[in-house]
Amino acid sequence: MNDRPTSMRASASGSTPIERVYFAWDDALSRNDAGGLLALYAEDAVFESPLVPQLLDRESGVLRGHDEIRPLFDKLAARKPPVRQYYRTGYFTDGKRLLWEYPRDTGRGDQMDFVEAMELNEQGLIQRHCVYWGWFGVRVLQRDEYHR
């Protein structure tokens, strides 16, 4: 097995657990499918994002397990700002960890900029997910655009 990270271009479907999560996660998010998103996570998954305190009125940005993650995905589906787009060019993986960027510059304008970093378990479910925000995305939070 090659432990070196691999860069992959997006294809029409996913044949490995990494590809399945990469395509299914983006698809569920773009359709505001909170249940579809949650189904990609292990029951005891850990999710971290600056959006957690913003939408759930919590001090911590860390959620543990489906019971804590579900309310975030429900609110995210209902409140996602229109500036949220889904342009990306591929991902990096070592077979267990999955990393991709939603870059600010899409070539057709700006979108909210994130890096999604996930670790999958042996069942191919997301065990740990950290979302890192770029400056354009942080400005969306500062302007309170998720509370529409």
Model-identified regions with their sequence ranges:
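A beta-strand edge to alpha-helix "cap/lid" segment located at domain peripheries
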Residues: 2-13, 70, 74-148
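Short, low-complexity N-terminal intrinsically disordered segments enriched in polar/charged residues
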Residues: 1-39, 43, 144-148
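Short charge-dense sequence patches
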Residues: 16-29, 63-69, 124, 128-129
